[in-house]
């Protein structure tokens, strides 16, 4: 029982660990001089020449942790939802979509920064744009994931309803943010910050509720045995 409780808490902590690694990547990658979709191909080449690719494994590990957290959410919600559990499955599908879209951009980033100033400007811009648009589309996956969390949690439980409702709101914000960016080419990601904050709160909440649920189960077993 103690080992199972420890493993459950460890799985729930994947969301918190994901945010830690994601923030590490964002802090290292936050550079006012970095090119965006409005930059010229030549400026992308010049920037790539002076900035070798960072620790891609950190971002890859962060994506794996996000997928694990999506599986944890699926498990909690699926246990409360009646068969066939379609809404809970949508949570898992959204997480898988978000992770897959982001990981798909890794080869483009590695080619761009490993070749440095040798890349043709048009090719360099295309590689950079692939990375940016991939991230924008990954927000759609995150939106599906949290939108499904909101629906399943409010209707069937499995997680606190306040957590489910706030997740649903953030899911809508993610979709609006992604749609606006994809339509205009802008690169503001306010909703992504809300997503990271929600994941932190959800991860800590699920870790705490694991202990509370186990204690309730023990008390119930003691009460049954005393009869």
Residue ranges of model-derived segments:
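Hydrophobic, aromatic-enriched alpha-helical segments typical of multi-pass transmembrane helices
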Residues: 1-227
